[in-house]
Amino acid sequence: VKAARQPEKRLKLYDMESCPFCKSVREALTALGLDAEIYPCPRGGKRFRQEAKRIGGKEQFPLLVDPNHQVTMYESKAIVDYLFRTYGEMKTPAGYRPGGLRPLAGATGALLRLRRGSAVRAAEAPKQLLELWSFESSPYSRLVRERLTELELPYILHNIGKEQFADMGPAAMRVKPGPYKPKAGGRREQVLAKFG
């Protein structure tokens, strides 16, 4: 899957970190390299759950809002298909189609983490959106997303998924030997240039 062009206005995702259906949508966003504003909606949350209900008509997650096409939608399969069709200009690849064992695998991961990221904890709201550079399958980023969800802290998710074989493995122990070189023109190259 090649990275999509960023839309003029950021996508908005009302999401629960521990939900396997939300995970499918975040995986599609990572695959396409799309940034999104994430509005965490943990159980017992008060900050964005009512806003999501007002926008979509029900308290169900994931909820995607695309201001570029005036689209508001529920259901992970529909959202994933929409993202690949609209921004990837392609059919949803087999590896990203929800169904089969995908929800079970996502739910198992949440259970192993004792459903962290699913229940609200009190926190002060930030004055502006926080920003997170991450990718869905990163175990390090998951810890951060879990806490952001629990604290109902909205953030801009900048997806910097793996773009080449040299990106595989933890930063200190990559699969490919030698000095790390990000893919020329890729998102990881941009992040390294900006933040070092």
Task: Label every model-predicted segment.
Residues V1-G196:
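GST-like domain detector, emphasizing the conserved glutathione-binding G-site
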